[in-house]
């Protein structure tokens, strides 16, 4: 990653040039999308009036690479956040204040035409800075605190199958008082089943445990495009909400006739439809209409992004925002890092299942700490140095610090009950926040992950010899970039919003 930014004396970003060179290994995999993501999502956090992006992915004789948590964003976010820290230091501005002066705002377009709706980046910054007392941090030797922010999409705006079919579909059936929701979305551990059950139950006045789910079975459930790009809560959740609202309208209509009132006077909740138990209303409706079945679908709105080459990567119906502060100590004699605490604030839109949301945040934090402190794909003479999980170092409970999770609800206008993603976003700011904290502790920059003791000691040695106190790449790969297209930026607030 290579980045150059033009900044005014007051800290306002004027222009940015971002270059990416990815080592893709032996095969193509998601190479084009991964490459474009490294440039597309930098603009969802900061206002960048003029932006130039160049990206290339090369084939090498290594294991093939593919997408993982935060697809295409951890590496460029690490580069950009440390880059902004260096700018803040150079112009004598607090790193948090520098970012605040450049944050995107709700209901705008980025320079690459991405649509921003709800945006809690300022709120998550305020909450995490206040909770960690970042502004009052101590300056004792070897102790450091680092800050970083990021954002992530709530599902890809374009489908993986090039057709005009819905991105997600749900069918809701009520028979003899029992409720079954059918959806093709697959719960791979992220808790999407609880989201679908909670959304349907909330609309029907039931408990989530009252909803029977049939998911991930293409023989019974309608199509959902899959569990990727943090899309299931937003897209399948909206489909479930539509199906449940249609079922609610049927039951409320029957209950209103039975009660002799208008549908608007019928209250739904606590297992009741007006004065009737849910089962009673369901039986009455089934006597009249037969088996009750409704469906719901979700298709992202049009015009989420631009029409230039590569614009299909990055658009999303919404974006979540995260901010992290890391507190640590570094031994200047050995470079060993002791993590003390991590604060992470996440703009969730609305938390549908707070326990699951907090679990996702903590999982993202721990995964980010593993990536920044110990995990690496290292090769020597063409051979992988960690060919098994026995050799590949990952964090355990012994290395992990206390994590304070702060949820910020901004109520996205298009999410189900205002909800947004949480599966991937919280990982992203943790990695640069650790490197920033190391610099705060010792005054050296480690511009390469993982940030290991030997790299810290080499940076300290460079500083002692009168150098810049930095460890990282010295030269950018000499690669040929594709011819660039010049694209006019959109209006700041188009009428489409």
Give names to the regions the model predicted.
Residues 18-27, 186-188, 342-349, 409:
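Short, solvent-exposed aromatic-acidic interface loops
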Residues 22, 36, 40, 148-178, ...:
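Conserved beta-alpha junction segments in alpha/beta enzyme cores
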Residues 12-17, 140-143, 175-180:
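Immediate post-signal peptide segment of exported/extracytoplasmic ligand-binding proteins
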Residues 9, 34-152, 199-497:
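C-terminal catalytic domains of large/alpha subunits in multi-subunit enzymes
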Residues 1-51:
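Active-site cavity-forming subdomains of large catalytic enzyme subunits
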